[in-house]
Amino acid sequence: MSIDAGKGTVVTRTREKDGKEKTSTEHMRLPPDLYNGLVTPIVKNLSPDSAETKVSMIVSTPKPRVITLVMRPMGTTPFSLAGFERKGLQYEIKIELGGIVGLIAPVVGKAPPDIYMWVEGGEVPVFLRETGPLFEGGAILRINLIGPSWPENNR
């Protein structure tokens, strides 16, 4: 998917069942807070004292649509790094589909699952872990840095 925010053009490329590539161009009214590809840097720089932060993102499902990501702090989780005890800031990321789809999706069991991300705050915030799907309908995956050790009961 490529986005030209200035022109409001979104181009998607998909592969059909017969293997042929299909290209679609959509002209959309794009919000000024569009943050595709920047979720991790945004979360790394959120204040743990903020109530919630909302940003817009385009997803290709397969037709492009604008969704809202609602990010909110969930407290801290202990972990250790090189034998030193630390605290990771945990954030929950909810996906708001909006419109009629947003109303129907939970009823028919198609609401996207929440995503959880942990960062270590400070002057230079660091990504630690993420739990959630990487694409629509994908399995819940956990992406970790290799070094930190986490409690067993942590999502």
Where are these regions (language model features)?
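Acidic, serine/threonine-rich low-complexity disordered tracts
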Residues: 1-6, 50-155
